[in-house]
Amino acid sequence: GTMQEVQQTAKQLGVAVEVEGYLPRDTAAEELTVAAAKECVTNCIKHADGNEVYIRIAERNHCHDITITNNGRVPTGPIREGSGLSALRHSIESYGGEMHISHEPRFALLITIPAKENEL
């Protein structure tokens, strides 16, 4: 799917998805970003009871740096990775990227995906 589709679906569920920065032009990197966005929308609704998801995409050191947060309830402790997040981590790591989850001061999904040379 595309980021537009994620935004439309989220909107129907009452969640606004704000994207700052540009999606990676590389298909695989873009798909991973979209998958992460989708997962975060689901988690925002299911666990955090939030209605806004923020996605920040930046380019740094030949990598796409993606940070996803929401305005929902702050987690009370470390996030347990459910099947959605571990599947996402698996996809990102098999592409050579990294995924970190922080829960302080609020939930954040931090993803680094290597950029292909022709994208830079």
For each of these PLM feature ranges, what is it?
Residues 15-38, 79:
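Conserved short strand/loop->alpha-helix "switch" segment adjacent to the catalytic nucleotide/phosphoryl-transfer site
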Residues 77-105:
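ATP phosphate-binding glycine-rich loop and adjacent ATP-lid/helix-beta elements
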Residues 14-22, 65-67, 99-102:
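Conserved transmitter core of two-component histidine kinases
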Residues 52-62, 69:
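Short beta-strand/loop element within the Bergerat-fold HATPase_c
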Residues 30-53:
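Conserved ATP-binding N-box helix of the HATPase_c
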Residues 63, 73-74, 104-110:
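Glycine-rich nucleotide-binding loop
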Residues 58, 100-108, 114:
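A short beta-strand-to-loop micro-motif at the C-terminal edge of the catalytic HATPase_c
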